[in-house]
């Protein structure tokens, strides 16, 4: 079974993954559990299926890598930096590096973010699964998930979960 590249992140109802200051404090449910699905999204189970995480320099600077000490982490950057511990800095074509990584034995690959990094993977059309948590908030402005001039990517809804107003949608490429 081949490895998959999986985008997994939260998005506001109007398509933003961070507020205009790069903040995430709006990523909360509405507190209403009346519509919760019986089966719930299990982030820890998701983490068990991956052994590699890909993130951009902004996510790295916010120290998101710290929650992935047991995983291999690739960081896309425009600078030449020395790798250390489980962190690999990629100054170049991150999509090619991750496609090469995908060919190796291992678990799935978590495309963590941010938006510019994800945009390069969308434009390369190499994301196998899209997991998006829709947060019940309209931000009005911020950092968008989807930038312009993307290819059409047809998806099939495989699963969905609702937890306190947050809807998690799990799509696979058709």
Label for each model-derived stretch:
Residues 1-174:
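Enzymes that bind and transform nitrogen-containing heteroaromatic metabolites
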